[in-house]
Amino acid sequence: METMLFSPYTIRGVTIKNRIVMSPMCMYSCDTEDGKVRNWHKIHYPTRAVGQVGLIIVEATAVAAQGRISSRDLGIWSDEHVDGLRELASLVKEHGAKIGIQLAHAGRKSEVDGEIIAPSAIPFSEKTRTPKEMTKADIEETIQAFQNGARRAKEAGFDIIEIHGAHGYLINEFLSPLSNRRQDEYGGSPENRYRFLGEIIDAVREVWDGPLFVRISASDYHPEGLTVKDYVPYAKRMKEQGVDLIDVSSGAVVPAKIRVYPGYQVPFAETIRREANIATGAVGLITSGLQAEEILRNGRADLVFLARELLRNPYWPYAAAKELGTTISASVQYERGWRF
């Protein structure tokens, strides 16, 4: 049986062998707290490549030490990180997958020691620290950090870069009126709140000509926050700037109760794809091959991003192929167990 899920997808000359993407998920495994790749990463990611995932996106990787979510996050703020990342990328590609990396800055949600920064001096919650409002110099320095991170990702041999603009981290904090109360050109109007992300995209594009994704939170789940309709013009602008795909998640810019169910974020990806005319990735409680195939067949997204399901089962593509009545190849070492 021919399937969409196991059909190839090409972006800017990079061909992903199927539409299955391992979503970036923090592993909090840098036990040396220096941001460097550890043995855990060198086992965790290649295992999913052996399992026939088409694209693996490495977890949120901090472009600045102060921009880590935790002290155990991966980093790309120094040239010293490149060798470990290069080895990781090579291991994944050795097993037939493409590899991406998510460039991130946690902003006010950083839990590292010392000063934290954000567009405005507003804490995430009553239980978290109040960040310092970023100066123009802070903004320029952070944009440069994203560009430097992209340059290092290129040196390390990554196929795809994703900019993390979701989940209440720094870029998302600029986009949302709930966290951005600035009175200058980086706050106020939707255009001004987009400016920080727009300048990051331009800076990354100066050093990176490969596929570029941006992850967004398409709903703030708050009456005064952003909705998917607000993100349509943002997505159009991203496309004009050379972004190739929007990875559509939601929430986490402020504390909120979110009603989750299988595929609960898929309608957001569908709306962005249809109304902004840009490729999208759907993510959020996608757990079966039939569910993934439906999303693709009905034009709701171009790629499916799996997170927790790939933690539970690194060989999910095999199970999905069996469910859909098709066959996929296995690594030679595993062929005895993968016969359909």
Swiss-Prot record:
The protein's enzyme class: oxidoreductase
InterPro entries xrefs: Aldolase_TIM (IPR013785), NADPH_DH_bac (IPR023663), OxRdtase_FMN_N (IPR001155), YqjM-like (IPR044152)
Gene Ontology MF terms: FMN binding; NADP binding; NADPH dehydrogenase activity
GO BP of this protein: response to toxic substance
Reactions the enzyme catalyzes: A + NADPH + H(+) = AH2 + NADP(+)
Any single Pfam family the record assigns to this protein: Oxidored_FMN
Annotated keywords: Detoxification, Flavoprotein, FMN, NADP, Oxidoreductase
Domain of life: Bacteria
Protein residues bound to FMN: 23-26, 60, 102, 215, 307-308
Disulfide pairings: none
Co-factor requirement: FMN
EC number from the UniProt entry: 1.6.99.1
Binding-site list for substrate: 28, 164-167
SUPFAM superfamilies per UniProt: FMN-linked oxidoreductases
Similarity comment: Belongs to the NADH:flavin oxidoreductase/NADH oxidase family. NamA subfamily.
Function as written in the Swiss-Prot or TrEMBL entry: Catalyzes the reduction of the double bond of an array of alpha,beta-unsaturated aldehydes and ketones. It also reduces the nitro group of nitroester and nitroaromatic compounds. It could have a role in detoxification processes.
NCBIfam families from the UniProt entry: PRK13523.1
Subunit structure: Homotetramer.
The protein, known as: NADPH dehydrogenase
